[in-house]
Amino acid sequence: MQRESFGSRLGFILVSAGCAIGIGNVWRFPYIAGVYGGGFFVLLYLFFLFAMGVPVLTMELAVGRASRQGAVKGYQVLEKPGSHWHIHGYFCIIGCYLLMMYYTTVSGWMISYLFKFLNGTFVAGMDADAIAGVFGSMLASPGEMTFWMAVIVIAGFLVCSRGLQSGLERISKVMMAALLVLIIALAVHSLLLSGAPSGLAFYLIPNVENVVSAGVGNVISAAMNRAFFTLSLGIAAMEIFGSYMSRENTLTSEAVRISLLDTFVALMSGLIIFPACFTYGIQTDQGPSLVFMTLPNVFLNMSGGRFWGALFFLFMTFASFSTVIAVFENISSFCRDTFGWSRKKAAIVNCLVVLAASLPCVFGYNIWQNLHLIGGRDVLDTEDFLVSNLLLPVGSMIYLLFCVSKWGWGFDAYLKEANCGDGIKLPKWLKPYFQYILPVLILIILIQGLI
């Protein structure tokens, strides 16, 4: 059977960027940037993004494009006879399932809040306790959380069942275009608020005092981690899109475009958050408390708050759902390639599997709220720890070693594939950096995540 392919270069870039752009761009990056020195952090982040993230992204894409296969089979096509690199492919799929076991729940929160702003659950004059109560009530209701999680899962597999070009590519183009329009509109609105100058100063102006206070080592570490994790590398989520892409452009050119689009969304998120928080004197935060308590409080303090709140959660729904459908495509592709299933069968079976597998995360906030797993973490944090702190860095290290070592695919074969087409070409003199320095940087991230 002939391998499907993207209908356009734009489609590939938007689908891949949609996979990278996620909740962390909004609820983690801006806060970390502000606390860890503003402009200093942003510059360090960009340095590590291009020094670490882009090279590993080209490697994952190269394995996919050269093999025209996804996880497992991509390794099998390229590895030397008798070697076992392909075993990592199975861990990639496990990582994708684990990621969806909690990401679908959090994505359900986004669409739930979109409807709460539309239906009048949030109204002007609500105080912080009432706003926090809405979030607490949602978490305490397994029925409500299961419903919205199921909406995300079913919608995601419906998109994938329609095919690559008719489903994933078409929907991603529309969502990503809408996402960019929404984030620009929200940022412009925030920049017109009275607290915009103070918010921008905190966010973007280099702050030596914050760097010293946080510790230079901690600032560098935070920039490395954020730059590495933002591209969702190490679990074949990008490899599958490499298997669908053309050979007309170099992989470095495409990786740079994906990374810049991801960075644009992260930076713009801060332009939404900080001017608004400084205008209304509300303490900034990160994580779920920022999105589901701090920002609703901000929106309800401003004129037309329900409208702006609805727009923000529509943006967040698109940001999270774009990641969901991208990872679903990887899972679906694995089942089609391994078991010979049709797209429709792969979508139906995986829809049922992910629905069932996502329930522990839902129940972890209510029925199983006293359940504590690795290091006392709840269900969601345990699943996130396994993916973010273990599978992503280990997987990235394996892709790196496969592409640069003589026991794997080999650096020359990787470089030939990466430089195929028009655009930015990687020079051969980078080989020592890829072989000796980049593995050390990834190892540092892995160790930091485990201690």
Q: Could you say what each language-model-derived stretch is?
A:
Residues S320-A326, A347-Y365, D381-L415:
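Hydrophobic alpha-helical segments of multi-pass membrane transport proteins
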Residues S5-S16, F41-L44, S83-Y97, T146-I152, ...:
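Select transmembrane alpha-helical segments in multipass membrane proteins
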Residues G11-I13, C19, T146-F147, L261-L267, ...:
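Loop-to-transmembrane helix boundary motifs in multi-pass membrane proteins
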Residues G11-F48, A236-G242, T252-V256, L260-L261, ...:
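Transmembrane helix-boundary motif of multi-pass solute transporters/channels
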Residues L373, R377-L401, G423-I451:
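A generic transmembrane alpha-helix motif of multi-pass inner-membrane proteins
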Residues R3-E4, I32-Y36, A66-F91, T104-Q165, ...:
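Inter-helical loop and helix-membrane interface segments of multi-pass membrane transporters/permeases
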Residues M1-W27, V56-L61, R65-L78, G82-I87, ...:
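Membrane-interface "cap" regions at the ends of multi-pass membrane proteins
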Residues Q2-F6, E169, K173-F321, I325, ...:
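Membrane-embedded translocation segments of transport machinery
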